[in-house]
Amino acid sequence: MTWSVFRSINTPTLDLSTALRSTRTPLVAAGVGCATFAGVSLFRMSSRSPPFASLSVSASSVKKEVVSTEKAPAALGPYSQAIKANNLVFLSGVLGLIPETGKFVSESVEDQTEQVLKNMGEILKASGADYSSVVKTTIMLADLADFKTVNEIYAKYFPAPSPARSTYQVAALPLNAKIEIECIATL
């Protein structure tokens, strides 16, 4: 199907006259979320709300609360350790730093993964959540060859049913970290 904003697109005609009791009409799309197909509108204009109106989010109605704990490393830039909003907590990417020193626990991906997950646990606890309330994690690895090793450690903290997860190899991480994990949890 061809979609266009504010203009019609002519494509080969389709004969649906028997089924739709209409003449042969080209497939026409006008605007996002509405189309005319063989003379039949797929989006009915009415006095009701515009399409997708229920998906809008008003920033003024969302109450945000900053989560901060000294039991996890401080943010390395202008961001929060976590934010609570709408019964969810959003944790920023966490590194394998020792909170008291700001230094990596070691250069090994195993030790950094353990420390990342411990730091995440402290931030989750400060927000009123825990590992069992995590619904989504995103893991960023400096080397995807560490995937299996990270999975073995990760499974100790997130037994089945595990949260939804994405894992990516990235070009670089802050402070040349081996791993960074962010997550979303319910409250």
UniProtKB/Swiss-Prot annotation:
Keyword Transmembrane found: no
EC assignment: 3.5.99.10
Keyword Transit peptide: yes
Compartments where located: Plastid, Chloroplast
Location of the transit peptide in the chain: 1-58
Main location: plastid
Tissues and organs where the protein is expressed, per its UniProt entry: Expressed in leaves, petiols, petals, carpels and shoot apex.
Pathway annotation from the record: Amino-acid biosynthesis; L-isoleucine biosynthesis; 2-oxobutanoate from L-threonine
InterPro entries from the UniProt entry: RidA, RidA_CS, RutC-like_sf, YjgF/YER057c/UK114
One GO MF term attached to the UniProt entry: 2-iminobutanoate deaminase activity
Superkingdom of the source species: Eukaryota
UniProt KW keywords: Amino-acid biosynthesis, Branched-chain amino acid biosynthesis, Chloroplast, Detoxification, Hydrolase, Isoleucine biosynthesis, Plastid, Transit peptide
A cellular-component GO term for this protein: chloroplast stroma
Residues involved in substrate binding: R165
Catalytic activity: 2-iminobutanoate + H2O = 2-oxobutanoate + NH4(+); 2-iminopropanoate + H2O = pyruvate + NH4(+)
Annotated signal sequence range: none
Broad EC category: hydrolase
Role according to the record: Hydrolyzes the Ser-derived enamine/imine product of Thr dehydratase, protecting the plastidial branched-chain aminotransferase BCAT3 (AC Q9M401) from inactivation. Involved in Ile biosynthesis.
Stated family: Belongs to the RutC family.
Designated name of the protein: Reactive Intermediate Deaminase A, chloroplastic
Source species taxonomy: Eukaryota, Viridiplantae, Streptophyta, Embryophyta, Tracheophyta
